Amino acid sequence: MLLVLVTGMVANVAFGQTAVTGSAPRPISCSDDPLHPIAGKPYDYSAILSPAAGSTYWYATKSTTFVTAGARTATEILTSPTTILSSATNYRVVATNATSPTKTNVTWTSEILKGVDATNPLFMVLEYKGPTCSNNMKVYQVLPKNAFTVDILNIKSNGLTPLAYGTTDSQCYADIASAKYDAPTSKMVYDYGINKLYFEVVAANFTGSFTPSFTLSGLKTGQKVLVEWTVDKTFASGLTALGAEQSATTGTPLNFAGTAVSPSPTVTDLTKGVSIYIRVTVKNGLYEGLTDDKLVLAVEAVNINNEPDIDNATCAAPASTYEDTAEQTLNMRPTVNPDPATGAFVVQTLP
């Protein structure tokens, strides 16, 4: 089994590449709502006014004292890429002649939700000045959920068509690229060509950035591998290597450095996910490939808060690492043996 480990995390987003929505992420079983939100998804917060037609003011805060001596003293959370996204509506504005129900719409970021729990609270506050006299205010407590996920699927090597989650793919080992006789050693030297494997990685329910890491299992001694990523689903541009090409040893993982990836500003609902695309280039070299070899690319990731991706089915930490996998098989080339009636083939150089 071929296992290439892509670990390491780099804080900077590589070369300005930003990811857009591609394949849909796997569904999650987490139940979310405005009081139990997930990062990157818009939520409505609303309240019924009686009588209506007064003035409303919505704001969020982590303060536990809201009003002192008749004046607002809570520290309001401003809109920004690391708090509440600027797409918020009816937020921190005085809305006159308010209708009932009144509402605000906000998208929480991963950063502002980090560490929020019952003892480190977050609130959405509504202040209401009635149309005739006096005022009132009410508070919603927000207890978020970490629903950050990362999934992986195969892309068909001929045509670059994404396959369904869990669908395997296969291709033949490449044809021989070169063959020559090496006079000093009296041996044949074969180059068994290059195979390229393609994958899509989908991250969802986060803001800011995510940093993936990978394992790839199955490479054999004599093969070399280069792992690259891009946000271009056609693989025509932006390919960036995750470290240098490395030589494989049967049964030994290879390590590559991961890179932080940000979603495109055009993506406003991160529950739909964003995608990066992975190309794995295998140089077979002296490895002949006389057996079917299963290659498994697995992925993990952390969000901008260094929180790991969850298990889609349980919404908890996975039972094991690198549980999101995609499998492809390199199908064996034919075996050719010498006929004893003729004699022996020229000995070949082995890995």
Where do the language-model regions lie?
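Extracellular low-complexity Ser/Thr/Asn/Gly-rich intrinsically disordered segments
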Residues: 1-351
